[in-house]
A protein has these predicted regions:
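Short, structured segments at the rim of ligand-binding sites
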Residues: 1-426
Length: 426
């Protein structure tokens, strides 16, 4: 297995970086642009495994996407709410956004579609979305009995009317339905039953839909009314990935350095910019600019924090916590267990591997700071495990990341960019 050794820095980090485009925004923009009337030009996009999966699937649905990697642009020929292909097999690897968004997109088509993924994808629930589509009149079902992919869709279009969907496992089910709704034959009302996790990702979806001309009304919390009218194609710029930025903010925090991330600001679409607030609670200082955020590392103290709304940065914080002066409790992230791996269990296991005392809870963990010993870090085919645990190696010698290539899912150049940022401090 390939590996990479993380070399500790000798001085506090100081630098500037612009992370690649947001995966969450890129895949949402691809879905919306595919349903739009007329062409869309997407700039600042992310080129990664997850976005390549989406583009390949759209191609199989006969929705062409032109890619210019050098310019970081995608050109999408929108189909005005139609799906040209009347039958397709879509392979989604382990891309949760792809399979969930595409399942709802296919429901707006006319024909038979099948969506599948790798072995881990076959363990990730999709039943709440399938049940919501079935209740709307689409013939949708999971092939297996574990409520996970493969998914079969047989449809003659997405009817209008009322759709209810559970939101306690993932907000992506709701986002998928919302984005497909303008292609329905009549207006759609989507209601969330129970708790909704990761609400900022839903807000991101709504803002992007409005940017492409969708008519949305939210008369009460988690109750959405969407008009049946096509999106309008446009030029749309993708923000840098705020989840990816968390690793560079954290690098400043653990080394006592100063890192400026370009292209993000307080009012960014991505809720994960609030990770900066978590680091400020731990003692860091932050400057919010019009098009940048600067984080200065200061002596860290432990905190008790609910990370439900920014759970994609929980692994990052877990790898900052060992350098604090007291324990850190991360709460309300049980849904992380259904991601690329059981992220709660994986983080606990690997922090214990480096000698730390960590208590696992059903909804999170408590991390007690202590000496970090050399170790080979298992990454569980999870890009965020590899990126998060690289932070330990910036201060502690002997940290080796196994399978660093798993970062190709969302950030292929991560270790190159981290090394460039650290070069002046070694």
């Amino acid at each position: 297995m390939e590996s990479i050794d993380i070399l500790p820095v000798l001085w506090p980090l100081k630098g500037r970086i612009r992370p690649p485009g947001s995966k969450s925004l890129t895949n949402r923009a691809l879905i919306i642009a595919a349903l739009a009337q007329g062409p869309s030009h997407l700039t600042g996009v992310l080129d990664s495994v997850d976005t390549q999966v989406m583009i390949d699937s759209l191609g199989r649905l006969q929705i062409p996407v032109s890619v210019d990697i050098a310019q970081r642009t995608f050109h999408v020929n929108g189909q005005g709410g139609k799906i040209p292909s009347t039958g397709a097999e879509l392979w989604c690897e382990n891309s949760g956004t792809s399979i969930r968004f595409l399942t709802a997109l296919c429901a707006a088509g006319s024909g038979r579609y099948r969506l599948d993924g790798n072995s881990r994808m076959r363990e990730r629930p999709i039943a709440p979305l399938v049940a919501a589509l079935a209740s709307a009149g689409v013939k949708a079902r999971c092939e297996l009995e574990n409520d996970c992919p493969p998914v079969q869709i047989e449809t003659d279009g997405l009817p209008g009317g009322r759709i209810r969907v559970g939101g306690d496992l993932s907000s992506q089910y709701l986002s998928a339905l919302l984005m497909a709704a303008p292609a329905a034959s009549a207006g759609v009302t989507v209601e969330v039953t129970g708790e909704l996790v990761s609400r900022p990702y839903v807000d991101m979806t709504l803002e992007m839909m409005r940017a492409f001309g969708a008519n949305i009304h939210e008369p009460q919390t988690n109750h959405f009314e969407i008009a049946a009218q096509p999106y309008v194609g446009r030029t749309y710029d993708i923000e840098p990935d705020a989840s990816a930025a968390s690793y560079f903010f954290a690098a400043a925090a653990v080394t006592g350095g100063e890192v400026t991330v370009l292209g993000l600001h307080r009012n960014a679409l991505q809720g994960d910019v609030k990770f900066v607030d978590a680091l400020v609670r731990m003692g860091c200082e932050a400057d919010w600019g019009d098009d940048s955020i600067t984080l200065r590392g200061k002596p860290l103290h432990g905190i008790d924090i609910d990370m439900n709304e920014i759970s994609d940065t929980a692994q990052t914080l877990a790898c900052v916590a060992p350098f604090a002066s007291g324990p850190t409790r991360i709460r309300n992230v049980a849904h992380m267990r259904l991601k690329e791996t059981d992220r709660v269990s994986a983080v606990v296991t690997e922090l214990q591997r480096v000698g730390l005392t960590v208590e696992e809870h059903q909804d999170g963990m408590t991390i007690t700071p202590g000496p970090i010993r050399p170790a080979e870090i298992h990454t569980y085919d999870d890009h965020r495990m590899a990126m998060s645990f690289s932070l330990l190696g910036l201060k502690a010698p002997g940290i080796r990341i196994l399978d660093p290539g798993c970062t190709a899912k969302t950030y292929p150049e991560y270790f190159t960019d981290l090394d460039a940022l650290c070069r002046s401090a070694r």
